[in-house]
Design a protein with these regions (language model features):
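A glycine-rich dinucleotide-binding beta-alpha-beta segment and adjacent secondary-structure elements
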Residues: 48-62, 221-229, 283-351
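C-terminal segments that line or cap access tunnels to active or ligand-binding sites in enzymes
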Residues: 189-305
Length: 394
């Protein structure tokens, strides 16, 4: 609770707001939570190997390994176990659509299919951006403030002159990327009662799997630990009747040379071979012998997709890993030190990786722009939103 109260919603612009009596009274514990890896805290807390893996696996969604992630991030499991796991009906697309709806209602002009090519600066001041639209036409958009939600490495090293870069190429040479991922989007005929809404399949020696991904010579672990989501079990919006929607995440090294995925097996050969093995693994481990034959829709995504389509540094699926030196106030800040009026949000900056923290990064920036150095979150309106009705399927 203290981590959430004092360290998750702050830009660390004024450390005094986090150095309260409440925090100082537990300073020794905070320091231990920062320097001790999550795996050690979990090992002290529970003895069952399965529980240790369940409590350690959230490190993957922080772009790291439980053997590298500071144990402060056990707060992710705390949120899951205390607040429960929520699901937006209609899928996560609805979250993004809702944000867009709110923005447009507030008068925001959202321009999609447009690639920003340069942040325009004059005498060290950000004055706008240059972008190319879907037709290939170049435009210049003036602005009093520029906020980049793009990959921070891409923003700094391709949109700014070297003299304007707070985080130049040499900065990234010393950083550790979070893992990339092999993603499988599957449409499967028939029901899959063998799978829950959320299913985790763990390697027996999962430390070996993490060492394969984060070691000095990264390799793809085989077999791998998998996360499987079957939202169609609760949401009729995501699959036609008689079919299941299945999403699979396989953590793999951040290396674009592993390849890119595509639709219906047309991705790079290595990616498609890995996908075949993953489907076979799910089939074997969960007792669905005919799973491969029942797949009617298949799309794969690999590190090359993250690098080429999202400009992700080294093809990471998440951002810089949450190691000690890349967490909390050691992580890249949300304001440029070289260009006035240039700010950052997203998984590359504070507070870090994951959809909740990316959304919090926007909140932290709002506070910074307002001159609010408080450590806690902004007040929430908590207006209820009705769930969408099921869509007709062709």
């Amino acid at each position: 609770e203290l981590a959430k109260k004092y360290f998750l919603y702050t830009s660390f612009a004024d450390l005094r707001t986090s150095a309260t009596k409440e925090v100082l009274a537990k300073a020794a514990r905070f320091i231990r939570l920062l320097i001790e890896p999550l795996s050690k805290l979990v090992a002290r807390t529970v003895k069952d190997d399965r529980l240790r893996k369940v409590l350690g696996y959230p490190a993957v969604f922080l772009g790291s390994s439980p053997y590298l992630t500071p144990s402060m991030y056990h707060l992710m499991s705390h949120l899951d176990l205390s607040d429960g796991v929520l699901y937006p009906m209609g899928g996560f697309t609805r979250v993004i659509e809702s944000i867009a709806d709110i923005a447009r209602t507030a008068g925001v002009d959202i321009r999609t299919d447009s690639k920003v090519t340069r942040i325009v600066t004059v005498d060290g001041l950000a004055t706008g951006v240059e972008y190319t639209d879907a037709a290939g036409t170049s435009h210049t958009l003036t602005a009093d403030t520029v906020v980049s939600a793009a990959d921070l490495h891409h923003t700094e090293t391709t949109m700014l002159e070297p003299s304007e870069q707070t985080y130049p190429a040499e900065y990234w040479q010393k950083k550790v990327p979070g893992p990339s991922a092999l993603l499988l989007y599957l449409g499967v005929k028939g029901e899959l009662p063998e799978l829950e809404h959320h299913t985790l399949l763990f390697m027996k020696d999962w430390q070996e799997g993490f060492e394969a991904i984060f070691g000095h010579e990264p390799t793809v672990p085989e077999p791998a630990s998998l996360y499987i989501c079957k939202p169609s079990g609760v949401d009729p919006n995501v699959a036609p009747e008689g079919y299941e929607n299945v999403f699979v995440l396989v953590p793999i090294p951040a290396d674009p040379s592993i390849g890119s995925g595509e639709i219906d097996g047309d991705g790079d050969p290595r990616i498609e071979r890995l996908a075949d093995k993953v489907i076979a693994q799910i089939s074997d481990w969960t007792g669905i012998p005919d799973l491969a034959e029942r797949v009617t829709v298949r799309r794969t995504v690999g590190p090359g997709n993250f690098a080429d389509e999202l400009n992700a540094w080294r093809g990471t699926a998440l951002g810089p890993a949450h190691t000690l030196k890349q967490s909390a106030f050691f992580r890249a800040g949300n304001v440029s030190k070289k260009v006035k009026g240039l700010y950052y949000v997203g998984g590359s900056t504070i507070p870090g990786i994951g959809l909740p923290m990316c959304l919090i990064s926007a909140e932290v920036l709002v506070k910074r722009l307002r001159g609010d150095t408080s450590a806690g979150p902004l007040a929430e309106p908590l207006t209820p939103v009705a769930a969408p009705q099921p869509r007709p399927w062709p």
